């Protein structure tokens, strides 16, 4: 018995302004364990995800500070009222941006018995250095906010106080892990009823999280009320999504009148989402108001919110909600689609389609917010397609 072995390997080269150069390798292999019956396949590769223009060429950040505003002061003649502002412009730096990489490994098998063909693939993906707009230590800057007022001696400086200005910049802080299983079962055409059946489905679970730190500013707008900005760790914070979907497709031929009718039944057996949280209620440090310097607390110094309050940092506490830790899941629901194609000639074909043809919109009560309901399924829509082959 001959066992055929096939393999492919390659590498892709990409060069993009700002983010530079990257090589993306890929290897695939398959072997026929039982010729014309059973084969195994696998692969591993790294795909480069290039940043969009938003991340390559971000716009500058602009801040407008009102130094004096007399527009609504009726005690001053309208022609003498002053309105003066200072505009601060920060260049958004993305020189440290890297090319995101998606690592994917997969393994599966293909089984052929007569007209029936079954293909099953298990895979795992990991997106590293994904793009996201985030605040970092470098996006906070101290600005001296000068305010003026009118006195008997004219316009005088009334206060000169530091404020922290911030913006979001392109970062590589996003990470996504996906694992799943896909299958495709093609039963083939049953000649007695002129109908072909195909079943496919997938189970998928996705985890996404961000690196770096998050920041909480509990200050009011007035310059005199500005406070240091709290630093929070994002370690342990993650969001999850999971679903299991199958699709049954039946294609029926009516040769006498040139009709092809395709009915698709999609079943969403399981769909859920939830979040996990780390230490998102205790700050790990703060940014000083005077110079935006980073001041980290000794590790483990504060373990309770009361300890933070007793140390005089109560204003840094962020009222967080862990409502999303409750797993939101929905019982099975279904969607049916129809496609009818008429072959008028060898050159012309007309198709009518209707998605969610029964207008099924199941409602499920939210587990996080009892009493509120979520409407599921795609919206109903239909249309006509005309295909002309020349």
Summary of predicted features, one role per range:
Residues 1, 13, 21-23, 101-105, ...:
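Residues that define the transmembrane beta-barrel architecture of outer-membrane proteins
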Residues 1-30, 350:
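Surface-exposed extracellular loop regions of Gram-negative outer-membrane beta-barrel proteins
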Residues 4, 124-126, 143-278:
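Gram-negative outer-membrane beta-barrel transporters
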Residues 4-7, 36-40, 115-118, 191-197, ...:
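Repeated loop/turn-to-beta-strand initiation elements of outer-membrane beta-barrel proteins
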Residues 11-17, 31, 35, 44-50, ...:
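Transmembrane beta-strands of outer-membrane beta-barrel pores
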């Amino acid at each position: 018995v001959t066992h055929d072995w096939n393999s492919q390997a390659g590498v892709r080269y990409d060069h993009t302004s700002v983010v530079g150069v990257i090589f993306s390798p890929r290897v695939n292999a398959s072997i026929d364990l039982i010729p014309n019956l059973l084969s195994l396949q696998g692969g591993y590769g790294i795909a480069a995800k290039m940043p969009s223009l938003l991340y390559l060429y971000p716009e500058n950040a602009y801040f407008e500070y009102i130094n004096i505003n007399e527009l609504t002061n009726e005690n001053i003649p309208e022609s003498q009222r002053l309105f003066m502002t200072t505009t601060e412009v920060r260049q958004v730096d993305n020189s440290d941006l890297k090319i995101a990489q998606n690592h994917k490994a997969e393994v599966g098998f293909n089984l052929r018995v007569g007209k029936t063909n079954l293909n099953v693939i298990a895979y795992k993906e990991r997106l590293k250095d994904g793009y996201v707009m985030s605040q970092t230590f470098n996006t906070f800057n101290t600005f001296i906010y000068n305010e003026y007022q009118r006195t008997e001696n004219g316009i005088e400086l009334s206060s000169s106080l530091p404020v922290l200005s911030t913006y979001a910049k392109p970062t590589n802080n996003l990470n996504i892990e996906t694992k799943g299983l896909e299958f495709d079962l093609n039963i083939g055409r049953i000649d007695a009823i002129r109908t072909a059946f195909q079943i496919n489905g997938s189970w998928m679970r996705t985890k996404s999280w961000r690196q770096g730190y998050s920041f909480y500013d509990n200050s009011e707008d007035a310059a005199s009320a500005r406070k240091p900005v709290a630093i929070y760790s994002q370690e342990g914070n993650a969001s999850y999504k999971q679903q299991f979907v199958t699709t049954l497709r039946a294609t029926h031929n009516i040769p006498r009148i040139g009709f092809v009718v395709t009915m698709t039944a999609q079943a969403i057996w399981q769909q859920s989402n939830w979040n996990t949280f780390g230490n998102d209620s205790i700050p790990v440090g703060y940014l000083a108001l005077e110079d935006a310097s980073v001041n980290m607390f000794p590790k483990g110094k504060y373990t309770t919110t009361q300890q933070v309050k007793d140390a005089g940092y109560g204003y840094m506490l962020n009222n967080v909600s862990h409502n999303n830790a409750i797993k939101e899941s929905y019982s099975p629901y279904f969607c049916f689609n129809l496609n009818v194609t008429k072959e008028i000639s060898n050159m012309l074909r007309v198709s009518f389609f209707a998605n969610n043809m029964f207008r099924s919109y199941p409602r499920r009560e939210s587990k996080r917010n009892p009493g509120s309901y979520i409407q599921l399924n795609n919206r109903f829509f239909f249309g006509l397609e005309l295909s002309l082959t020349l």
